[in-house]
Amino acid sequence: MLYYLFQWLDKYDFPGAGMFGYTSFRSLMAIILALLISSIWGDKFINLLKRKQITETQRDASIDPFGVNKVGVPSMGGVIIIFAILIPCLLLGKLNNIYMILMLITTIWLGSLGFADDYIKIFKKDKEGLHGKFKIIGQVGVGLIVGLTLYLSPQVVIRENIEIEKPDGQIEVVHAAKEIKATQTTIPFFKSNNFDYAALVGFMGEHAQTAGWILFVIITIFVVTAVSNGANLNDGMDGMAAGNSAIIGLTLGILAYVSSHIEYAGYLNIMYIPGSEELVIFICAFIGALIGFLWYNAYPAQVFMGDTGSLTIGGIIAVYAIIIHKELLIPILCGIFLVENLSVILQRLYYKAGKRKGVKQRLFKRTPIHDHFRTSMSLIEPGCSVVFTKPDKLFHESKITIRFWIVTIVLAAITIITLKIR
């Protein structure tokens, strides 16, 4: 909104109004404003949650030895993150930009889904919250909206990066002059770092391109669901999900920035995406909101984000990566979320396999995997065998959190470095 106001004022030479025409200025303003909202208004909102007794009431002491200190801590703090993202974007973003619109829809949609889950847990006293099938339906819904919009909107185009060999043998990356709609995505080790989903259905001949888009929509739904649930599982320790997501957000912001500048896109040998510069403003608000929230969520937490926050930030990361055609980098960049998901899935499969044989067995002491590192073998039910019993020494949750942050930083660096490997 302010963007349009200052654009109008600039016509009358209003001092400083021209600054709002620069993406860099609006991005800086977005991160500052989001940080202020989440840190200053966040404190007031936490006090409101305390007065309304919207707090944690149940903690499994067998999993969390520090759980007694967490009972009574306000939950649903994800509302702070959501408002700290939405307000700067609505004020500073171009609201006619299709990418900004999709990110705002994702934030509101998944925020509402997570809010419903937390509401049922806290106010209806149902620890299971929203039924799993309704969560999946909500996640599939946003994935379907994003996938179909990217397919149907004429604003969604790319300029393909092409490698040209010079007479001296050097490789130069240039971008095609024509903007096209394509099912291409960025992936390391492939020619020009591009992979076309349509290539997987090439046997369909003249219908391959349409089939490629259908495949893209299906992959979009899968990625949104997987990453959203991964972030939800990762939110099990003070500061864990907020810190990891901020690091991932910063990496995606760098990729969006270079994708929106044809020269930088050429340097990293990735496609140029016109209009994606508005995504930098969104991700700056996202990072600012998470850092401000982390002020209160770091150990010992004064507030928890709840599913209101975790489902939302996971979905935001997924949709953002899809929009900038970097969804196939998610297994590397969001490796922590992937491992959290896999640990839960493998644990359940292994446990059920043993149950059919009449044997109590587990792969890990506890899942998601971060709980494995703080669970003593003495807490495992008698007669249950565990495959991975190490480490014998238990770690404090703050140490586990910081080490997971470090792993995410390393994965973020690897994600960008792989784009330069040819």
Please name every model-derived segment.
Residues 59-73, 127-138:
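Juxtamembrane helix-capping/reentrant segments at transmembrane boundaries
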Residues 18, 121-130:
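Membrane interface segments of multi-pass transport proteins and intramembrane proteases
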Residues 2-44, 83-112, 144-185, 191, ...:
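Alpha-helical transmembrane segments
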Residues 43-61:
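Membrane-interface helix-loop junction between the first two transmembrane segments
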Residues 61-70, 125, 201-209, 266-274, ...:
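Short juxtamembrane and helix-loop transition motifs at transmembrane-helix boundaries
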Residues 180-208:
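P-loop potassium selectivity filter motif centered on the GYG triad
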